UniProtKB/Swiss-Prot annotation:
Function recorded in the entry: Catalyzes the condensation reaction of fatty acid synthesis by the addition to an acyl acceptor of two carbons from malonyl-ACP. Catalyzes the first condensation reaction which initiates fatty acid synthesis and may therefore play a role in governing the total rate of fatty acid production. Possesses both acetoacetyl-ACP synthase and acetyl transacylase activities. Its substrate specificity determines the biosynthesis of branched-chain and/or straight-chain of fatty acids.
Entry's Gene Ontology BP terms: fatty acid biosynthetic process; secondary metabolite biosynthetic process
Assembly information from the UniProt record: Homodimer.
Reactions catalysed according to its record: malonyl-[ACP] + acetyl-CoA + H(+) = 3-oxobutanoyl-[ACP] + CO2 + CoA
InterPro entries in alphabetical order: ACP_syn_III_C, ACP_syn_III_N, FabH, Thiolase-like
Keywords, comma-separated and alphabetical: Acyltransferase, Cytoplasm, Fatty acid biosynthesis, Fatty acid metabolism, Lipid biosynthesis, Lipid metabolism, Multifunctional enzyme, Transferase
Name of this chain's protein: Beta-ketoacyl-[acyl-carrier-protein] synthase III
EC number: 2.3.1.180
Pathway annotation: Lipid metabolism; fatty acid biosynthesis
Active-site residues, record numbering mapped to chain: C114, H238, N268
Domain statement: The last Arg residue of the ACP-binding site is essential for the weak association between ACP/AcpP and FabH.
Species, as recorded: Neorickettsia sennetsu (strain ATCC VR-367 / Miyayama) (Ehrlichia sennetsu)
Annotated segments matching region ACP-binding: 239-243
Length: 311
């Protein structure tokens, strides 16, 4: 049975950098307040690029990093996003065209908000294990700035734009060791954006639900697999808020040195945060072969997921 392997990583961040000090000029906030409550220092904002363009540039970066690989080998394209620039066609369809892949391959979007990348990875794993595909371009891309109310200091300080891409291929070892994707729909109104509207969030409910659901889900993952916290090499959470990341890390008892944090640089990029973080780690040479990675994410819906992956 084939295993799901990560072949290469790529990312793209827009040119405009918005600092906490810039936000002090827009709303009643301060660098000290934002940093203390979120851990965020900067975020990137797309002024000219739409989500498809962000996805395209991240994909090119990813494909360029893949050794001895031709994009003609891509069997499918999946884009995780909740900020598509068109209702139709899907961003993945447009990305396929931008990449010049004229063959009739599978391409579609996944919208599970901030959990989107893990939901999409679950789909990719099922397709590779079943033998349906051999190579998939998996992208998380978001233009969160397009659904933000820039007069709402409770939300505008949290989000950023960007895209991350992972080239996933069939291999003989490693891969997904465990995954659990779910949705607690009773919290569906806690975080939402109406069509044509801006994002609304009950921050307290989201914070408490994230801590509770993910701590329990991670505990179940470790119990089911028999993998101890000490055996994990990295803990990569959706980069929403440093307090959530650190508190869950503390609750599961993982060494702080294994917790990967990029929210300070990029803010909350929704479905793009995990692949951007992977690309960041790869560019710094910090992912070793055979490493066990614990992924966890939560997002609107209220979706959440946990994946244990051997690199």
């Amino acid at each position: 049975m084939k295993k799901t392997n990560f072949l290469s990583f790529g990312c793209y961040l827009p040119k405009k950098v918005l600092t906490n000090f810039d936000l002090e000029e827009l709303v009643d906030t301060s660098d000290e307040w934002i940093l203390r409550r979120t851990g965020i220092k900067t975020r990137y904002i797309a002024e000219e690029e739409d989500v498809c363009e962000l996805a395209f540039r991240a994909s090119l970066n990813c494909l360029e990093r893949a050794m001895h690989f031709s994009q003609k080998e891509v069997d499918a394209i999946i884009v995780a996003t909740c900020t598509a620039n068109k209702r139709l066609p899907a961003v993945a369809n447009m990305l396929q065209a931008r990449l010049g892949i004229g063959r009739h391959i599978l391409s579609f979007d996944v919208n599970a908000a901030c959990t989107g990348f893990l939901y999409a990875l679950s789909i990719v794993d099922a397709m590779i294990v079943s033998g349906k595909v051999s190579t998939v371009l998996l992208v998380g891309a978001e233009a969160m700035s397009t659904i933000i109310d820039w007069n709402d200091r409770n939300t505008c300080v949290l989000f950023g734009d960007g895209a991350g891409a992972v080239l996933v291929s069939a291999g003989d070892s490693g891969g997904v060791l465990y995954e659990h994707m779910a949705c607690d729909s009773s919290l569906g109104e806690a975080l939402l954006a109406e069509v044509g509207g801006t994002l609304k969030m009950d921050g307290r409910s989201v914070f408490e639900a994230a801590i509770k659901r993910l701590t329990l889900a991670i505990g179940e993952a470790l119990k089911t697999t028999g993998i101890s916290v000490e055996e994990l090499d990295y803990f990569i959470m959706h980069q929403a808020n440093i307090r959530i990341i650190e508190l869950i890390g503390e609750k599961i008892g993982i060494d702080r040195s294994k917790i990967i944090v990029t929210v300070d640089r990029y803010a909350n990029t929704s479905a793009a945060s995990i692949p951007i973080t992977l690309a960041y780690m790869d560019s710094h040479g910090s992912i070793r072969k055979g490493a066990k990675i614990l992924f966890a994410a939560m997002g609107a819906g209220f979706t959440y997921g946990v994946t244990i992956f051997e690199y």
